[in-house]
Regions:
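ATP-dependent carboxylate/acyl-activation modules
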Residues: 1-42, 46-77, 83-253
Length: 253
């Protein structure tokens, strides 16, 4: 694993990051004998939203560096520690999760192969409220000079405080089929058995439940993952929900 860091210190711009990592690549392959596929670049994810103008392009610098590195060295992997990005908003989990999810959405499209991230704190890109997503992406792409201020205002009085995110249970008001599909898409295990018991009273054949609402949910997961709007840790949570559902139904089949 090679960081974008040399004798001059931490590389901050895309040009510097690429130059440092290109040099490291040559040293590793030409002198040390490493195969390109054994090298992982970490261009360093740096904090945005700090109030310091020079930091405004840090997210863009990482994404642009990733794109250029993958074009030049396709066999070499690119990684990054995502939590650094939102350090300015520590204490506001809702905003931080949205920042991480939106950043990953765009970084993966640029070629990011892997990331260090809290898998339990990743929002599904499509589920980020539009008003929050707009402000987050304004910040990530430095689209307006007041991007940081607008996101801070949106974060509200919870900025700097530890805030617990309350689960939105509005989806529990839907049909049992809709609830099962929702549980699979979002990896929610709490209500699976109760909902399956209710579904069994409406469907004589348990296989109909699997082929109906459960597979409907997994199709959505596949579409979201395939389009980059859902990430692997979230897919794993969905798979666990599916496994729990099928295990519950097996004795009745």
């Amino acid at each position: 694993v090679v960081m974008a860091f040399d004798e001059q210190g931490q590389a901050e711009t895309a040009d510097r990051k690429v130059a440092v990592l290109e040099r490291a690549y040559r040293l590793l392959t030409d002198r040390a004998g490493y195969h390109p596929s054994d090298i992982v670049f970490d261009p360093a994810v740096l904090a945005v939203g700090t109030g310091i103008e020079e930091h405004n392009r840090y997210a863009m610098a990482f994404i642009e560096t990733t794109r250029r590195l993958k074009a030049a060295f396709p066999e070499t992997k690119v990684s990054g520690g995502i939590s650094n990005l939102s350090f300015s908003f520590r204490g506001n989990d809702t905003v931080r999760e949205a920042i991480h999810s939106a950043f990953l959405f765009h970084a993966i499209r640029a070629g990011l192969d892997m990331a260090i991230v809290n898998a339990g704190q990743l929002a599904v890109y499509e589920d980020i409220p539009p008003e929050l997503l707009e402000r987050v992406e304004d910040l990530l792409f430095d689209r307006r000079p007041d991007a940081t201020e607008r996101l801070v205002q949106f974060a509200g009085p919870a900025q700097g405080e530890v805030r617990k995110k309350e689960a939105d249970l509005a989806w529990r008001n839907g049909t049992v089929e809709a609830r099962l599909s929702h549980a699979l898409v979002h990896g929610v295990l709490d209500f699976v058995e109760a909902d399956l018991e209710e579904a069994r009273s409406a469907h004589a054949d348990p296989l109909a439940i699997i082929e109906g609402p459960l597979m409907d949910g997994m199709k959505v997961v596949g579409e979201l993952f395939g389009s980059g709007r859902m990430f692997l840790p979230q897919v794993v949570k969905s798979a666990r929900a599916m496994k729990k559902a099928v295990s519950f139904l097996q004795p009745y089949m």
